[in-house]
Amino acid sequence: QVFETELLEGEDVVGMVFKNAQRTLSETLEAIDRKAIKESATLIAKARSVFLMGLGGSNTLAQDAYHKFIRTGINCQYAADFHMQLMLASQATKDDVALIVSHTGEGYDTLALAEELRNNGAKLLILTSNARSPLAKLGDYVLSVSPCCSKIVAESFSARITSLVLFDVLYVEILELMENTGVENLNKMRDVIAKRRI
């Protein structure tokens, strides 16, 4: 759903979109469970493997988390295709953690991933705008993103921005937990990328 109503004539589109994003960030910050963030980061830092999963638009968010977390040296697993994600989930163990991203938390395929991971003993971190969803109920920790109340921009648009910020928060928390090891791994990544620049 892109538009819920027609854009009012003369409305400041730039201001409206930015204000919606700012409101979503502010509301999420006020409601955020800081303990859940820290404990989620600890699980990720100690995991054998971290599976980063999401479908549709949520898959691009999962890929962003993958792009961030591999900088720390953590063993991360990511796939764009649902069947590939399901295959990864089938290999999960009790020593693994999965971060599943879903705006609604109600998709059949996303639930199938969560159930397979849970059946294999993996810890589940759920990032969603719907903390009462079937997916959220399967999670060990739920990181809630405040849904935007815009009448024009779909909720998931603003939720995406907040999700990216929450990944940044987790990334920094993980680096702090890893101390020197995390910094060393980050520097290795920076060095190898720098060699490819003119």
Model-derived segments and their meaning:
Residues 21-24, 28, 40-43, 65, ...:
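A ubiquitous structural signal for well-ordered alpha-helices
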